[in-house]
């Protein structure tokens, strides 16, 4: 869990913002949402494979767009 130390004469709002930012970087909220409900292992694998396919298609489209601009 991210820990922040209050600086001298630091407003609470600024400290809260720093804490939220550190939680965001640590991925605590995303992890909590992911673990909120049980997900079957087959569903996890299926979602991971779909994400990999999406990344691959995105990479291919970027390469094709780059080739088109070169001509």
UniProtKB/Swiss-Prot annotation:
It holds the Pfam family Ribosomal_S21. It comes from the Bacteria. GO terms for molecular function: structural constituent of ribosome. The keyword Transmembrane does not apply. GO terms for biological process: translation. Keywords: Ribonucleoprotein, Ribosomal protein. GO terms for cellular component: ribonucleoprotein complex; ribosome. NCBIfam families: S21p. Belongs to the bacterial ribosomal protein bS21 family. This is Small ribosomal subunit protein bS21. It comes from Psychromonas ingrahamii (strain DSM 17664 / CCUG 51855 / 37). The gene is rpsU.
